[in-house]
UniProtKB/Swiss-Prot annotation:
This is Phosphoribosylformylglycinamidine cyclo-ligase. GO terms for cellular component: cytosol. GO terms for molecular function: ATP binding; phosphoribosylamine-glycine ligase activity; phosphoribosylformylglycinamidine cyclo-ligase activity. SUPFAM superfamilies: PurM C-terminal domain-like, PurM N-terminal domain-like. The lineage of its organism: Bacteria, Bacillati, Bacillota, Bacilli, Bacillales. CDD domains: PurM. Keywords: ATP-binding, Cytoplasm, Ligase, Nucleotide-binding, Purine biosynthesis.
Amino acid sequence: MSKAYEQSGVDIHAGYEAVERMSSHVKRTMRKEVLGGLGGFGATFDLSQLNMKAPVLVSGTDGVGTKLKLAIDNDKHDTIGIDAVAMCVNDILTTGAEPLYFLDYIATNKVVPEVIEQIVKGVSDGCEETNTALIGGETAEMGEMYHEGEYDLAGFAVGAVEKDDYIDGSAIQEGQAIIGLASNGIHSNGYSLVRKLIKESGIDLNDDFDGRTYLETFLAPTQLYVKPILALKKAVQIKGMNHITGGGFYENIPRGLPEGLAANIDTQAFPTPNVFNWLQQQANIDTKEMYNVFNMGIGFTVIIDKKDVAQTLDILKQEGISAFEIGEIIEDKDTPIHLEGVE
């Protein structure tokens, strides 16, 4: 049976080896609330151990987009899993939820145990940094669905927040401050354009760029904001949060704003990493479009009362994150976001 299955394009033994290789990485992500071990039909998590009065579960799912193609083409698979985790946990974090567990899905042309191990290592690194248990996953070998060497990666995260602490933006008011947390580069959006520009420019990805190679710059993993935001939440009343992903500033910052309010952003209040200047020069596009595609150096925003700005910046600095007061909430019924220095 297994021989016939292998002849049809599925290598069971390679799958077994991949599971064996990834197990040590997965185990280091475990939390005390996880019941049972690896390999069950369903993964279990004991919410009662969180000692929450009225827990609200928050879930999110996402992928890494065509950044995967850049990783695959350059045989660099050990950090792309961090991106998968970050795209999910940063999203659910905007509600004030603490990420609890994560599941991954890898679909590939052919299971290569060494590659699968590197992918899952990255996922585990992201989970370990955010205290999120990698509680389950699926690796699917589908030769007829993908070209040789190709794979896709997606993730699913679940977190919890006390019902009374749930952040939905309803407490946002005119005059409150917007704090921007620095990104780690491009993160995981806009890579169809990025890859096009890499090809057209003819650069050698191993050449130096701004203190590291081009490849390291383009594959720098998405920043994880869980630890600094959870630390901030203990000290400051957060009114709203946004994860700056696809659609850049224009699509993400207005999300969750009450009707009649808008965000006024000073684009001179934070530094723009050189990689975005390079992309803009290569693409020959205007600055407004850049802010409509990329994070431009700000990967996450927090809305707080003005009186809490100094304390917020201090806490985030202690947590190792560069942060800036980048704007404020204003009254505007027509235009949900204004970018000073761009428009």
